[in-house]
Amino acid sequence: MNIRMVLLASAAAFAASTPVLAADAIVAAEPEPVEYVRVCDAYGTGYFYIPGTETCLKIEGYIRFQVNVGEDVGGDSDWDAVTRGQVQFTAKSDTEYGPLTGVIVMQFNADNATDQDAILDSAYLDVAGFRAGLFYSWWDDGLSGETDDIGSVVTLHNSIRYQYESGTFYAGLSVDELEDGVYQGTVDPVTGVFTADDGPNNVGVAFGVGGTAGAFSYQVTGGWDVDNEDGAIRAMGTVDIGPGTLGLAGVYSSGPNSYYSSAEWAVAAEYAIKATDKLKITPAVQYYGNYFGGGTEVPEDYDGLGDAWKVGLTVDYQIVDNFYAKASVQYLDPDDGDDSTTGYFRLQRSF
């Protein structure tokens, strides 16, 4: 009897304590409200706000597969397949000086499973017309086809520049670091060893002026290589005529330098035919006076060099939106060397 009473008393005590235990139970916290990604349409399509900030970000890039063709282009082989992936991040935000822009471009290249590289293709900041960082110069611009050879050997520099823009017109000036540019020097006739006249190039000054006027677009670009004490100037323009666009360009170099070293002068022409909404065919031609051929080790002048001419054809086809195919073939015939035929076939998916 006593045992029964003890058990009943214990059960009653346990039942009485149950509300206290319930009050002490762990309660799950309310979930924080989620801030979904918001579209930013202030700077064009593709931008979104970085959550918690007023900075707009755009992510774009492409995947490219390409087969190059030419004599020994792949070492002992006359063809070589390569693949590239590129991603670009562009950040923009409003300031009292106008939009503040930052760009980072990463590029990944693969010749095969073991021969690969990852490079910083561009990284710069831009505000109120001023730009500083690693970016391509105006000398990287060219005609739309693949035949013209009117640019620098190296067009990607650590630079600082100012560019004024007003509607369809722009004009700018840049100071470029040229330490990976062109070196003037001499070649020993016995050993064939090249000896540079000076150390690494350290600075160059370039300008660019361009714009559009109706169906006509134009650009004038110049550059002075301080170490080599030579410069170059180039003019090019395009105009819509008939079913396509005519492009013309001319360049002059006072001596081999980091802005232009292929020849003392050259002229180029192309006609980009828009055959259909998806197909473009571009035949082109270029003539060089006192042709050297480019490279980073160059003579002190162009004296005694022969001329050269080049013809080519480029075909662009849009398979579907953001998916393109391109084929190009080029023939070069220099007076002082062997002629050559090169080309490539490319597939590219952009996003």
Language-model region placement:
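Outer membrane beta-barrel
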Residues: 46-181, 208-212
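Transmembrane beta-barrel strands of outer-membrane/channel proteins
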Residues: 63-67, 104-108, 132-136, 173-177, ...
